[in-house]
Amino acid sequence: MKGALGSPVAAAGAAMQETFGCVVANRFHQLLDDESDPFDILREAEHRRQQQLQRKRRDEAAAASGAGHRGGRSPAVASGHRPGAAGRRESQKERKSLAVSSAQQPDSPGGPQPPGQKRTPRRGEQQGWNDNRGTDVVLDRAERRSYREYRPYDTERQAESTAEKFTDEKPVDRFDRDRPLRGRGGPRGGLRNRGRGGPGNRAFDSFDQRGKRDFERYGSSDKANRMEDSMGGCGVRTWGSGKDTSDTEPPAPMEETSMMEECQGVLDEESASKVPELEVEEENQVQEMTLDEWKNLQEQTRPKPEFNIRKPESTVPSKAVVIHKSRYRDDIVKDDYEDESHVFRKAANDITSQLEINFGNLPRPGRGARGSTRGGRGRIRRTENYGPRAEVVTQDVAPNPDDPEDFPALA
C-alpha cells in the first residue's frame, strides 16, 4: 500500500479532494496495485477440475481393462504404475499405450469399450440393458419410413382399408402410425373437410377409424320400437291383442275430423259477423279535424262546474226608509269613478299635499387650495378664502327627528 500512495491515481484523487472537496473514487486506495483478471482465476480453476476428471476416468478405464485380462499383468501394471517406478506418476504416453493394448486383446470380447469409442446404433436397431450380463442387447425392428416423408393421404387410407377388410385382426398397429383423423381438424397443412362430421370421412365409413364398432342409426325413436313390440305381444299396455287395438283405433280419426269441421264452421261465422263491425269502427275512428275543432269538441264534452252563488234581491222591501240623502249625485260619482279609476283613495288625515318638499343640494365640504399656508389639502372650506361670496354660502339646518314638522306622520 505504500507504493499505492505514491501512484498517479492517488495523486489525482488528492488533487480532486483539495479542488472540489468531494471524492467518489477509491477513498482508501484499495486494489490499486492488483492487475490480475478475476476471469483468469476462474478459467484456471475450471481447467484444473477438468484435468482431475480426465485423470480419474483414465484410471478407472485402466483398472477395468487390467481386471478383464486372464492371468495377464501384475497388480502393479493393472493399477497403472510400472514396477520400477513406485513414487513417480504415470505419463500420458504410457496411459495411451495401455488403453490401445487393452483394446487389441482378442480374448476379451465381453469387456466394456473405453469411453468415447462406442458405436452408434444402426437404423432399425434399439439398445436395451440386460441386468444379467450387463451388456447391450440389440433388438431388430421393422424399418420405418422417415418422419417427413410425403405420402398422399387418399392412397394411404385406401391401402389401410383394403388391408383391414380381408383381415380379422384388430387394428392394434394404428398406435404406431400417424392418425390425422383423431382431432377436430384434418391433417397438418391441407386437405379440407377432414374434421368431425366433414364430408372427408364419409368415403371411409366401411373401415374402422378408432378400433371401435360402428352402429347403424335409424330415424325412429326407441318409444316407437317398444310400441311395436308390445303390439306383437299383448297389445297396448297389456290389454287385449294387437288385432283388437287395430280394430278399435280407426274410428278415432273420423271423430276428430268431424269435430274440426264443426269448429271451423263456427269460427267462419264469427269472423264474418265481426268483419263489418270492425270496418264500421275504423270508419268512425278515422276522422281528420283541425286543432280548433278538436278543442271545441273537448270543451263541449267536458263537464261544466256548477257553483252555488247567492244572487242579490232586486226588489226593494216595502218597509225601507231613507235615513239621509247622499251628498253627491250618483251620476257624477259614477263618471268620476269611471274616469279616475286608476287613482287610489286618500286617507282623511293625509297632510302630504300641505307639505313643501324642496330638493336642494347641501354645500359640499371643500378641499381647500393647494397653495395653503400649511401646505396641504384642507378638509374644511374657510370663509376668508371666499370674501365676496360669503353671503351666497348658506348652510341649512339638519332636520330634527323629534320634530313632527320635519318628520310628518305617514298614513
From Swiss-Prot:
Induction: Up-regulated in response to mechanical stimuli in cardiac myocytes (at protein level). Its main location: nucleus. It is found in: Nucleus; Cytoplasm; Cytoplasm, Stress granule; Cytoplasm, Sarcoplasm. The modification Omega-N-methylarginine is found at R70. Phosphorylated by phorbol 12-myristate 13-acetate (PMA)-activated PKC isoforms at Thr-352 and Thr-373. Methylated. Methylation is decreased by phorbol 12-myristate 13-acetate (PMA)-activated PKC, in vitro. Residues 87-97, 138-181, 205-229, 292-313 have a biased composition (Basic and acidic residues). The C-terminal region is necessary for nucleus and cytoplasmic localization. The N-terminal region is necessary for nucleus and nuclear bodies localization. Regions containing Arg-Gly-Gly repeats (RGG/RXR-box) may be preferentially methylated by PRMT1. Ribosome-binding protein that promotes ribosome hibernation, a process during which ribosomes are stabilized in an inactive state and preserved from proteasomal degradation. Acts via its association with EEF2/eEF2 factor at the A-site of the ribosome, promoting ribosome stabilization in an inactive state compatible with storage. Plays a key role in ribosome hibernation in the mature oocyte by promoting ribosome stabilization. Ribosomes, which are produced in large quantities during oogenesis, are stored and translationally repressed in the oocyte and early embryo. This is Intracellular hyaluronan-binding protein 4. It comes from Rattus norvegicus (Rat). The lineage of its organism: Eukaryota, Metazoa, Chordata, Craniata, Vertebrata. The gene is Habp4.
